[in-house]
Amino acid sequence: TIQYFFSEVIAMFKNLGLQLYSIRDYMKDPEMADFAFERVAKMGYTEAQTAGNAFDAELFGKLLTKHGIKIVGTHYDYGEIINNPEKTMEIHRMWGTTNVGIGGMPGEARGSLANLNEFIDKFNKVSEIYAKNGFKLTYHNHNFEFVRIDAFKTLMDVMYEKFNPDTISFVLDTCWVAAGGADVCAWIEKLAGRIDILHLKDITVVNENGRITPRMTEIGNGNLEWNRILKTAEETGVKHYVVEQDGFFLDGNNPFASLKASADYLKPFIK
């Protein structure tokens, strides 16, 4: 039984997306991917954000199209984005998306403010190449971006201030914002007009031998206020709503029961 912890459910968006990292174990070859795409399409997922592709990119895209799923963005290799923009744009054109993304910054970029600024400068510079060709770079956060990089500002604050808003958008992840101790709706409002893709991921806490531990979970099974989050997202111009669950599935290592639970919870919000 799905429970809604508010009095009224209001339809907010037209299409439900899936970050394919959620089904990464099924992305290893065309047969497994075909099977997985068919299953999630039947659950109501009509959009996807990629997380790499282990086989031919053209076939990968065709399999998604076969099941009525449109690619709306990617998490792509950072080195390829920086060093091989022409090939990267060619693949994204073939996939039919203008959102070229990374799942996070290189590890060394978090080490110091100087390193962070170097990463931002490089990402800003290459984003201009993509923008001239009709693309936009995207950045997906985790919780470490909410660590204070100096006495006053978090990494997220610095990126908010220094990323070029005309050429780079944020893929804001609801779970990781909350796990970073920040206010999800406040960040959606702060980034108004700069979030094309919102990652829908719930968070709960579990008791592990007396230790209270945060854990991602199915939409509606955690502690986030989805009515408020989705209303704020709609009001601020979010274009794509993409479910992601990295792990901790209802059925062991099988993600499908969890993805169906999230899709079922979100169906009343779909126009």
Please state what every model-predicted region is.
Residues 22, 49-52, 75, 141:
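Residue-level recognition of beta-strand->loop/alpha-helix junctions
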Residues 3-42, 54, 65, 93-96, ...:
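Histidine-acidic metal/acid-base catalytic patches
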Residues 50, 74, 102, 243:
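Short beta-strand and adjacent tight-turn residues that come in two discontinuous sequence segments
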Residues 45-65:
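Glycine-rich, proline-tolerant flexible connector loops at the mouths of alpha/beta enzymes
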Residues 75-77, 106-113, 175, 216-220:
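The substrate-binding groove and active-site-proximal loops of carbohydrate-active enzymes
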Residues 38-42, 47, 58, 70, ...:
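Active-site acidic/histidine proton-transfer and metal-coordination neighborhood
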